[in-house]
A protein has these predicted regions:
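Short beta-strand/loop motif that positions the catalytic acidic residue
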Residues: 208, 214-216, 220
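Active-site loop/oxyanion-hole signature of alpha/beta-hydrolase fold enzymes
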Residues: 52-94, 260
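Gly/Ala-rich beta-loop-alpha elbow adjacent to hydrolase catalytic centers
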Residues: 95, 99, 103
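Catalytic histidine-centered segment of alpha/beta-hydrolase-like enzymes
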Residues: 246-255, 259
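Conserved alpha/beta-hydrolase catalytic His-Asp/Glu region
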Residues: 128, 133-134, 148-206
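Conserved HGGG/HGGXW glycine-rich cap/lid loop of the alpha/beta-hydrolase fold
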Residues: 8-63
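Flexible "cap/lid" loop of the alpha/beta hydrolase fold
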Residues: 104, 108, 114-148
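Conserved alpha/beta-hydrolase "acid-adjacent" motif
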Residues: 221-227
Length: 274
């Protein structure tokens, strides 16, 4: 489906009915990243959730526009999108990497509309960002399998700081959920887009008191984890989970723990709304 926002055509998919959950992917991937890790979770729960997956401008099936220069504008686009498909409705938001920054931007601007927050390896900007932990390490590597890949595929898969487990299982999900989007992203557009807000998304007027889950990878070289921990007091209902043997693709490398922690978070959100 397509939603007209300003002069943009935002590609999106809706799965299921019930409480709306807005899924925001990170920088360069598309909706398939969130769909790939979240749909298996929702298949294991009995409650009803309306899952909304969409492509940010310049990524996936949503074309960017020259006037989009910064993340403030990107946030405005998301809010307009929400107003169009969920007019006046409260919702839950889940964001990965850059999408985690955008999700916190939504809470900063409209905290009363959000009933729960999931942050998956989110981008954080604060005083510890320059030394944010996350020392990349490869724990499992199947050299026989890797040598069977094309040089191009192997270079994507082994890129510094991304996949700390390099085997066929992780590769299969990486090629299903992430790699295709990386190959079609508009890098010219992204190169002219500021990945920061002009404001501090975490400078909330009051703490966010809804069920929150913060997931971080101990070996996440891309965004680390210390900056996220610094936010814990601003989200008093947050569970903070730091997983070993997990880089920036935590949801794939530690898929079992990811599923269980997200299920527990969904249960908290559901009971809070009853």
């Amino acid at each position: 489906m397509v939603c007209d926002v300003k002069d943009l055509k935002i590609y999106y998919e809706i799965h299921g009915e019930g409480t709306p959950v807005l899924m925001i992917h990170g920088w360069s991937p598309d909706h398939r990243l969130m769909k790939g890790c979240m749909e298996p979770v929702f298949q294991t729960v009995n409650s009803s959730w309306k899952r909304i997956y969409f492509d940010l401008p310049g990524m996936g099936k949503t074309t960017g526009a020259p006037w989009i220069k910064n993340s403030d504008q990107m946030l405005d686009i998301i809010l307009d999108f929400v107003d169009a498909i969920l007019p006046g409705q409260p919702f839950v938001v889940a964001g990965e990497s850059y999408g985690g920054l955008l999700a916190r931007g939504i809470i900063n601007k409209r905290p009363e509309t959000v009933n729960g927050l999931l942050l998956l390896c989110p981008v954080v900007e604060n005083e510890v960002t320059q030394d944010n932990g996350g020392k990349f390490q490869v724990f499992e590597k199947d050299d026989i399998f890797l040598n069977g890949l094309s040089e191009d595929d192997r270079n994507y898969f082994k890129a510094e700081g991304i996949n700390s487990i390099q085997n066929q299982r992780v590769w299969q999900r990486y090629t299903d959920e992430i790699l295709p989007a990386l190959r079609i992203a508009d890098y010219s557009f992204l190169g002219n887009l500021s990945g920061r807000f002009s404001f501090n998304a975490d400078a909330l007027e009051k703490p966010f008191m809804k069920p929150t889950l913060m997931l971080a990878g101990r070996q996440d070289f891309i965004v680390g984890y210390r900056g996220l921990w610094q936010l814990i007091d601003r989200y008093p209902r947050a569970s903070f989970v730091l997983l070993d043997k997990a880089g920036h693709n935590l949801q794939i490398e530690q898929d079992i723990l990811f599923t269980e922690t997200v299920k527990e978070w969904l249960h908290r959100v559901e009971t809070e709304m009853v």
